[in-house]
Amino acid sequence: MIKKRSILIVTRKSPLALWQAEFVKQQIENSHPHLACQILGCTTQGDRLTTEKLVDSGGKDLFVKDLQKALLNRDADIAVHSIKDMSACDGPELMVGAFIRREDPRDVLIVKGELSTLPPHAVIGTSSPRRQCQLKKFQPGCKIKEIRGNVGTRLAKLDAGHYEAIVLAAAGLKRLGLENRIHYYFDPHEFIPAIGQGAIGVECRSDDHEMQTLLKSLDHRETRLCVTAERAVNEKLGGDCFTPIAAHAIIKNDQLSLFAMLGKIDGRVIIRATEIGNSEEAQRIGFKVASQLLEQGGDSLLRELKQ
């Protein structure tokens, strides 16, 4: 019997991260029967920070850096990430070799009781500045309360009565078979999702040409183009996970429509921009939308946010 070559996949240990890694494993093994994948679970620095705010400790990159270190040390061949956890730009030594077909990118509201009985001054759980900003516009009287943990932990905190509602990504709930918990889907044109939300990225070393070729079979063109446009917005703005920035792209008949916003956490200022163009010019569209945001006062807003 010919021994199959083993591909080492590094990922976080949360149920959602393991689901995503298992999905990528199956995709690789189905497309390349001569390969066998092994999943390596990693507890990242972000996972270890159970009480501190991410904004005080380095941001979402803390969920990514340990996985990237495993790639650079050649302890793994590929790393599986939620794209929304990644920085706008890849370093020269690493690259996203495949963007897996995107799941539902929308944000959703999960309520402890019934949506119809949610009070105007409800305590809503989220740690995202982007969500806080848009929630204050959507429900001005609500009280925002920080929440940490994976999907299951956050749902348990809601069920225990610590919150009256929480905001999560539809994609994670659907992947974990928890779609029945969703009470309300936010319109992605009004309540704009996080950059890359719902998309999975498979990262590899830039010098590993064999792995790059292998990952091409997993790459979903439409997802790659949409995420490229969204990430270009943040690349030009220079935002981070502390900045209320959102961007969402869709493609129809090879035309890419990009919606973006930049605002203050309290929701009192929200700047919006939209652009439509050829999907092959995804990055240019993203840069143009970012320029529109800056021209509308985004430059001074960013300076204020970074003070």
From Swiss-Prot:
Report any one BP term from Gene Ontology.
protoporphyrinogen IX biosynthetic process
**Gene that produces this protein:** hemC
> What EC number(s) does its UniProt record assign?
2.5.1.61
Q: In which pathway does it act?
A: Porphyrin-containing compound metabolism; protoporphyrin-IX biosynthesis; coproporphyrinogen-III from 5-aminolevulinate: step 2/4
Under the heading SUPFAM superfamilies, the entry gives: Periplasmic binding protein-like II (SSF53850), Porphobilinogen deaminase (hydroxymethylbilane synthase), C-terminal domain (SSF54782)
**Protein name from the UniProt record:** Porphobilinogen deaminase
The UniProt record's further free-text remark is: The porphobilinogen subunits are added to the dipyrromethane group.
Function, as annotated? Tetrapolymerization of the monopyrrole PBG into the hydroxymethylbilane pre-uroporphyrinogen in several discrete steps.
The GO terms describing molecular function are: hydroxymethylbilane synthase activity
Which reaction does this enzyme catalyse, per its entry?
A: 4 porphobilinogen + H2O = hydroxymethylbilane + 4 NH4(+)
S-(dipyrrolylmethanemethyl)cysteine: residues carrying this PTM: C241
Q: Does the keyword Transferase apply?
A: yes
The record describes how the cofactor is bound as: Binds 1 dipyrromethane group covalently.
Q: How does it assemble?
A: Monomer.
Q: What is the lineage of its organism?
A: Bacteria, Pseudomonadati, Pseudomonadota, Gammaproteobacteria, Legionellales
Query: What domain of life does the native source organism fall in?
Result: Bacteria
**Cofactor(s) required for function per UniProt:** dipyrromethane
- Sorted UniProt keywords: Porphyrin biosynthesis, Transferase
